Amino acid sequence: MEFREQVLDLLAEVAENDVVKENPDVEIFEEGIIDSFQTVGLLLEIQNKLGIEVSIMDFDRDEWATPNKIVEALEELK
C-alpha cells in the first residue's frame, strides 16, 4: 500500500469519517472532523502503525490542517 493511502486510511479510522479520503483538502479541525482528543489518538496511531514519532509539542494545527498537509508533514518525518 502506498504511504499516502496508509496515512489517509489511518486518518479516516481515527476521524471515523471517510470525508478525509474523499476530500483531502478539507479543513479537519475547522470542520470539526477531528477534535483535540482524536489528535492525540492520531499521533499515537501514526507512531504505532507507521513507526513515525510525532511529539504533541511538534504538532502544529496549521501545518496539519488538511489530510494533504498531514501526508506532506509525515513524508518529511519518515
Curated annotation (Swiss-Prot):
Keyword Cytoplasm in record: yes
One term of GO molecular function: D-alanyl carrier activity
O-(pantetheine 4'-phosphoryl)serine carried by residues: S36
PROSITE patterns documented for this protein: CARRIER
Any one of the GO BP annotations: cell wall organization
PTM description: 4'-phosphopantetheine is transferred from CoA to a specific serine of apo-DCP.
Residue ranges annotated for the Carrier domain, each copy included: 1-78
Protein keywords: Cell wall biogenesis/degradation, Cytoplasm, Phosphopantetheine, Phosphoprotein
Entry GO CC: cytoplasm
Pathway(s) where this gene product acts: Cell wall biogenesis; lipoteichoic acid biosynthesis
Compartments reported by the entry: Cytoplasm
Keyword field contains Ribonucleoprotein: no
Gene3D superfamilies: ACP-like
Principal subcellular localization: cytoplasm
Protein purpose: Carrier protein involved in the D-alanylation of lipoteichoic acid (LTA). The loading of thioester-linked D-alanine onto DltC is catalyzed by D-alanine--D-alanyl carrier protein ligase DltA. The DltC-carried D-alanyl group is further transferred to cell membrane phosphatidylglycerol (PG) by forming an ester bond, probably catalyzed by DltD. D-alanylation of LTA plays an important role in modulating the properties of the cell wall in Gram-positive bacteria, influencing the net charge of the cell wall.
NCBIfam families listed in its UniProt record: dltC (TIGR01688), PRK05087.1 (NF003464)
Family: Belongs to the DltC family.
Protein name, UniProt field: D-alanyl carrier protein
The species this protein was found in: Staphylococcus carnosus (strain TM300)
